[in-house]
């Protein structure tokens, strides 16, 4: 009842009095204000508000009640909206990045497709090239097999139906070319041969009379032989001119030009060489070898690789009696331009082969017996060293012989049963006098080379200067016909 009465009579003065009492109490209890200040200094929760209520003041004791009320949810909605906005921005940026990545993937896919297409094209081209190379190798293998078989059979058969010339081919020579050759003979008669440098111009040419003449006495002296050659040269030219006119009138010029290439012959070169092959200036590739009878050294077979379809072949074999001697046998006709380093040997062998084929074509025997052995076999070869090389241009039906002279030579004869072969023996070391050199130079003037490889700036003659310093002429011409011999040691 008392409390109710107090509440009923509670006036503004009483309120002021209560406030003063509170301040006094706070001063008395220092902690009270300090705690209140601390409470004020502490951040209140955003969702609550603090209220202080003082109930009673009894005997200096103060009961302070603090009430907290939850604030309205406006601030929470603002925070959630900002969070949703950030998430939307992140989602949009992620979508943009995914779109860029997809576009990049599309570009990479197109680039990969283009690369794959180019790769397939290159692969197809590679397969085509490999297929072509395989076809070429198979065709070349077939040609090599047939060529090897042909070369093996040619060692046992006597066939004269294939041409031999290691210079430029004369199989397509026309009528004008024949007249040019005859004109060159007259030009060489008027020109002198220079002997200042120690080089040997090696050129051979032969002319034959179709009508038989009486056999003149054989004289091996250099003076008589050279005089006979010079005296008979004009007669030979007149006879050749008459024959050429006859061929033109009868239309047989092409037939004659095509008959000589159908002959078959070989040129064998004997040199002292330590290398497996002789350096003749051409490029060769080995395609086989075999052991021949009577010689323990293998015989190697080579083909010319200067041109893809060149038919020239050569055989290389050591001499059975002297292993330091290398025997190289050439066969075939070059169908390409010769390198400068190969013209010397080619012109030399071409002149020898032309002489051999010309001699066989003027023989009355359509199938003469021929020989193809070297002069090193003592059982089948006989030689007589004389002071000169004698060319016996014979008519086998009437046994007519016309001797021609070359200095420092020998005559050889060998057994038959092989192809006609002319041998160049470069292994002789016999000495020669200055007169022999002059006679040889005169003969090279009388018999010029058929193919001229010389020009004003360079010399491609066959040079034996290292041998000439020792006063020797190591050249051998051997035509192994039974009655025709061209030999020089």
From Swiss-Prot:
DNA-binding positions: 273-339
Region described as Disordered: 1-100, 131-159, 234-267, 356-381, 427-454
UniProt entry keywords in alphabetical sequence: Coiled coil, DNA-binding, Nucleus, Plant defense, Transcription, Transcription regulation
A GO cellular component annotation in the UniProt record: nucleus
Superkingdom per UniProt: Eukaryota
Further information: Plants silencing WRKY72A show a reduction of the R gene Mi-1-mediated resistance as well as basal defense against root-knot nematodes (RKNs) and potato aphids.
Role played: In association with WRKY72A, contributes to basal defense against root-knot nematodes (RKNs) and potato aphids, as well as Mi-1-mediated gene-for-gene resistance to these pests. Both WRKY72A and WRKY72B are not required for gene-for-gene resistance mediated by Pto, another tomato R gene.
Family, per entry: Belongs to the WRKY group II-b family.
PANTHER family xref list: WRKY TRANSCRIPTION FACTOR 36-RELATED, WRKY TRANSCRIPTION FACTOR 61-RELATED
Full protein name: WRKY transcription factor 72B
């Amino acid at each position: 009842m008392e409390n109710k009465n107090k509440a009923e009579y509670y006036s503004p003065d009483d309120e002021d009095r209560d406030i003063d009492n509170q301040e006094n109490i706070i001063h008395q209890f220092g902690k009270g204000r300090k705690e209140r200040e601390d409470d004020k200094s502490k951040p209140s929760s955003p969702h609550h508000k603090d209220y202080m209520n003082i109930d009673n003041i009894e005997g200096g004791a103060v009961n302070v009640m603090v009430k907290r009320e939850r604030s309205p949810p406006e601030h929470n909605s603002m925070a959630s909206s900002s969070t949703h906005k950030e998430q939307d921005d992140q989602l949009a940026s992620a979508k943009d990045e995914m779109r860029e990545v997809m576009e990049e993937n599309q570009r990479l896919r197109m680039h990969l497709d283009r690369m794959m297409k180019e790769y397939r094209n290159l692969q197809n081209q590679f397969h085509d090239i490999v297929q072509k190379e395989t076809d070429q190798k198979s065709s070349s293998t077939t040609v090599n097999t047939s060529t090897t078989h042909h070369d093996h059979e040619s060692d046992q058969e006597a066939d004269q139906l294939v041409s031999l010339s290691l210079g430029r081919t004369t199989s397509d020579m026309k009528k004008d070319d024949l007249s040019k050759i005859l004109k060159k003979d007259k030009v060489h008669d008027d020109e002198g041969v220079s002997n200042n440098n120690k080089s040997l111009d090696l050129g051979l040419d032969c002319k034959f009379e179709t009508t038989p003449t009486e056999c003149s006495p054989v004289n091996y002296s250099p003076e008589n032989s050279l005089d006979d050659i010079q005296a008979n040269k004009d007669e030979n030219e007149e006879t050749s001119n008459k024959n050429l006119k006859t061929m033109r009138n009868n239309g047989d010029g092409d037939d004659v030009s095509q008959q000589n290439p159908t002959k078959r012959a070989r040129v064998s070169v004997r040199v002292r060489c330590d290398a497996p092959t002789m350096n003749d200036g051409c490029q060769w590739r080995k395609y086989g070898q075999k052991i021949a009878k009577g010689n323990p050294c293998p015989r190697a077979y080579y083909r010319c690789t200067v041109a893809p379809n060149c038919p020239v072949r050569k055989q290389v074999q050591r001499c059975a009696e002297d292993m330091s001697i290398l025997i190289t046998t050439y066969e075939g006709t070059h169908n390409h331009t010769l390198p400068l380093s190969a013209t010397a040997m080619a012109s030399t062998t071409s002149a020898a082969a032309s002489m051999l084929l010309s001699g066989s074509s003027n023989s009355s025997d359509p199938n003469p017996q021929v020989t193809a052995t070297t002069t090193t076999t003592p059982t089948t070869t006989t030689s007589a060293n004389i002071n000169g090389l004698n060319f016996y241009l014979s008519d086998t039906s009437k046994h007519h012989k016309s001797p021609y002279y070359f200095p420092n030579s020998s005559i050889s004869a060998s057994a038959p049963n092989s192809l006609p072969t002319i041998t160049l023996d470069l292994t002789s070391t016999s000495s020669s006098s200055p007169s022999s050199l002059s006679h040889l130079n005169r003969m090279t003037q009388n018999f010029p080379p058929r193919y001229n490889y010389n020009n004003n700036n360079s010399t491609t003659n066959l040079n034996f200067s290292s041998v000439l310093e020792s006063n020797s002429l190591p050249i051998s011409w051997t035509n192994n016909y039974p009655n025709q011999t061209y030999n020089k040691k």
